[in-house]
Every structure is written in structure tokens, then in C-alpha cells.
Amino acid sequence: MAFWNEKTLAQMSTQEWESLCDGCGKCCLNKLIDDETEQLYYTNAACLLLDNKAGHCQNYEQRFSFVPSCTKVTVDNIESLTWLPDSCAYRRLFMGRELPTWHPLRTGSKEAMILAGMSVAGKVTCETKIRDIEDHIVLWPMKDVE
């Protein structure tokens, strides 16, 4: 049986916890909240550390030094990180859901994730090149497939 089915999030080792991240890059997208409706919107404006072609952080180990606003997902804050997409493994497991069939832990590679359209790779622009972020609102990051 897979470790994510045997253990709670709190019981996982650091290595197990880190391996839950599928590397989709959706958490690295700039998000907007409508002041009137409090609706969350994703944009295709990505963190300056995100490799736009590969869809992952270019300096993951030192990301907090370069981007102090970067959020570290932990067992202690997962409940409050409601902005994480429903496809996020941390969020899915916290909500009592299974990892999707395309998840790298289940398939052995990121290829199925990319084919399922779950990665930001090739779909984003660096935030430093964006002028009017409202023009970059997108719906695809909210997509969740089993």
C-alpha cells in the first residue's frame, strides 16, 4: 500500500511530504481576489523563479531568499491555504481524496500530468513581463481531473 494511503499528512517524513508535490507549478501563479465578491482568480503570470518551459521552480531550495512571499505548504497551514487548486495533492489528501491517476507518484513520471493538462509548463508568462495582470486571468489552473 502506498505511503499516502497508510499515513496521515502529519505522520509523513519530510521526503514523503515533498514527494507529494507533483510539480505542476499552479501554486507559483499570481492570483487575484475580487474585492466585492471575494472570488479567487488565477492568472497566467508566474513567479519570477518559475521555469516557464519546464513548469517548476528554478531555485527551489533557496526560493524564500529570492521570493519572501513564497508560501511553504506544511501540515500546519494546509487547512488555511484554500487558494491551492483542487488538483493539488496536499489539498486532495487533506480533503480525504485520493491522488489522481496522473500523479507522478502513481505513474513514475510527470508525463501523464503534462498530458492531462495539469502542468503550467508552456502556458505562463513571467510576472515581471506583465503590465496589466487583470488581462491575464485564466480558468485552466482550476481544472481538476482524476
Swiss-Prot record:
Where on the tree of life does the source sit, at the highest rank? Bacteria
Q: List the disulfide bonds.
A: none
**InterPro entries associated with the record:** Puta_zinc/iron-chelating_dom (IPR005358), UCP006173 (IPR008228)
Q: Which family does it belong to?
A: Belongs to the UPF0260 family.
HAMAP family assigned to the protein according to its UniProt record, in alphabetical order:
UPF0260
What this protein is called in its record is: UPF0260 protein Shal_1839
What high-level taxonomic lineage is stated for the organism?
Answer: Bacteria, Pseudomonadati, Pseudomonadota, Gammaproteobacteria, Alteromonadales
